[in-house]
From Swiss-Prot:
GO terms for biological process: adenylate cyclase-activating G protein-coupled receptor signaling pathway; negative regulation of smoothened signaling pathway involved in dorsal/ventral neural tube patterning. This is G-protein coupled receptor 161. It comes from Mus musculus. It comes from the Eukaryota. GO terms for cellular component: ciliary membrane; cilium; glial cell projection; neuron projection; recycling endosome. CDD domains: 7tmA_GPR161. Keywords: Cataract, Cell membrane, Cell projection, Cilium, Developmental protein, Disulfide bond, G-protein coupled receptor, Glycoprotein, Membrane, Receptor, Transducer, Transmembrane, Transmembrane helix. The keyword Transmembrane applies.
Length: 545
């Protein structure tokens, strides 16, 4: 019986050893087959592909980093997240991708174990930080579009710095476990780089995907979903407003022209407005789909590959699919400067100005040095493809072409910096009655939002100082009166009523004011009674002693 059990155990061990050896030999054969498949043409095509990816990642992110760094007014709070995103992608192209290029040529890792672990950590860290930064940018745009008036209070400089620090700490927590025993780091001959051994610890693979990929992806879906819903609602409101305006204009013009021509022109304008707003709505939808679609296309295949490896083993994925899924994740670093950098009108025009010299600057940037907190808000809104009309309504103002009829505040827009810069200005319904004109409104103010805030702060500071001065003056007066009262009481206690000046017992009456005279006499009597009671109390106290 023992002999049979020993034989079965030996056979099972032998089968396991054979399966492991066959697995290793199978992967080796696949590697050799992949290397020899297509001859030198396949190796050359892979080399050219990874070289192109590396160059595009490096140049694209470097251009955005330099543009934002040189033009300080562009480095708003929102663009600080973009700056961090592109800078991390640039570091990926410098510290990781060159070694991937070398490994794709040599078909092995030649840089040692230490650098293998370090490059794997860098790849995971930068990739995780990039995905989390996309989620933070979505939150920033959410507040800019849905709550533009409280955006400067919600998204502050300190909170932006704290968000960036949190992004990197969050990413570091998700990337350190392979260096401390939960999973491990290995050179993957089909990814041509050192990565975490996703097939060894399925638990870590699922943890990293949820912690660093699924979490920001859900944030993006929720935030951009709310943004698009608000854009649709505001577009309907603007469209209804234009219909009312057209009808009123038609009624006015009907008094001068025939009703037939008026109705036809009104219907044409109404149709034109509907086309414009539907186009803006489609542009916003396209922008959101591009942002989310780029994330899914670049990172989706890689997530599917590592999930398959974690659940069904290393050999379940085709080597070619594994290679291209990994390299497709590198292309996300190409999409980021395009979507979050060049998609921005202001950044794009500044970049063209840097490339084509001062002539382009003079034509496009007359007031490019003006800075504003609401410049950042408008950037976030217009980057989503929303029209100035929608931007005005989302900020709580009126559509362009309408003046405020309720009016504490109104909004006008300027294209000075290549985007819709929002300017806050005052208006009243009495001085500015509502007018419906088809011509574009004139710019009524060039005062920036920060200037308005500074003026309000100065006025509040002056009023606060005035109130403090009045309070101190009242306190000083009260203290002086209290001191005189204490002094009078002390004199009464020591010297009696005769020591006090006679003016205290003289009632001030105003001639012709009978009520004031009677009130003064009653006050005098009350004072005498109080002094008499005090004096009698002092005498009784002396007799008792």
């Amino acid at each position: 019986m023992d002999f049979v059990q020993h034989a079965l155990l030996t056979a099972s061990r032998g089968a396991l050893t054979m399966s492991l050896n066959s697995s290793l030999s199978y992967r080796k054969e696949l590697s050799n087959l992949t290397a020899t498949e297509g001859g030198e043409g396949g190796a050359v095509s892979e080399f050219i592909a990874i070289i192109i990816i590396t160059v595009l990642v490096c140049l694209g992110n470097l251009v955005i980093v330099v543009t934002l760094y040189k033009k300080s007014y562009l480095l708003t709070l929102s663009n600080k997240f973009v700056f961090s995103l592109t800078l991390s992608n640039f570091l990926l192209s410098v510290l990781v991708l060159p070694f991937v290029v070398t490994s794709s040529i040599r078909r092995e890792w030649i840089f040692g174990v230490v650098w293998c672990n370090f490059s794997a950590l860098l790849y995971l860290l930068i990739s995780s930080a990039s995905m989390l930064t996309l989620g933070v940018i979505a939150i920033d745009r959410y507040y800019a579009v849905l709550y533009p008036m409280v955006y400067p209070m919600k998204i502050t400089g300190n909170r932006a710095v704290m968000a960036l620090v949190y992004i990197w700490l969050h990413s570091l927590i998700g990337c350190l476990p392979p260096l401390f025993g939960w999973s491990s780091v290995e050179f993957d001959e089909f990814k041509w780089m050192c990565v975490a051994a996703w097939h060894q610890e399925p638990g870590y693979t699922i943890f990293w995907q949820i912690w660093c990929a699924l979490f920001p992806f859900l944030i993006m879906l929720v935030c951009y979903g709310f943004i698009f819903r608000v854009a649709r609602v505001k577009a309907r409101k603007v469209h209804c407003g234009t219909v009312v305006t057209v009808e009123e204009d038609s009624q006015r013009s009907g008094r001068k022209n025939s009703s037939t021509s008026t109705s036809s022109s009104g219907s044409r304008r109404n149709a034109l407005q509907g086309v414009v707003y539907s186009a803006n709505q489609c542009k916003a939808l396209i922008t959101i789909l591009v942002v989310i679609g780029a994330f899914m296309v670049t990172w989706g295949p890689y997530m599917v590959v590592i999930t398959s490896e974690a659940l069904w083993g290393k050999n379940c994925v085709s080597p070619t699919l594994e290679t291209w899924a990994t390299w497709l994740s590198f292309t996300s670093a190409i999409c980021h400067p395009l979507i979050y950098g060049l998609w921005n009108k202001t950044v794009r025009k500044e970049l063209l100005g840097m490339c084509f010299g001062d002539r382009y600057y003079r034509e496009s940037f007359v007031q490019r040095q003006r800075t504003s907190r609401l410049f950042s808000i408008s950037n976030r809104i217009t980057d989503l493809g929303l029209s100035p009309h929608l931007t005005a309504l989302m900020a709580g103002g009126q559509s362009l072409g309408h003046s405020s009829s309720t009016g504490d505040t109104g909004f006008s827009y300027s294209q000075d910096s290549g985007t819709d810069v929002m300017l806050l200005e005052d208006g009243t319904s009495e001085d500015n009655p509502p007018q419906h004109c088809t011509c574009p409104p004139k710019r009524r103010s060039s005062v920036t939002f920060e200037d308005e805030v500074e003026q309000i702060k100065e006025a509040a500071k002056n009023s606060l100082l005035h109130v403090k001065a009045e309070v101190h003056k009242s306190l000083d007066s009260y203290a002086a009166s209290l001191a005189k009262a204490i002094e009078a009481e002390a004199k009464i206690n020591l010297f009696g009523e005769e020591a006090l000046p006679g003016v205290l017992f003289t009632a001030r009456t105003v001639p012709g004011a009978g009520f004031g005279g009677r009130r003064g006499s009653r006050t005098l009597v009350n004072q005498r009674l109080q002094l008499q009671s005090i004096k009698e109390g002092n005498v009784l106290a002396a007799e008792q002693r």
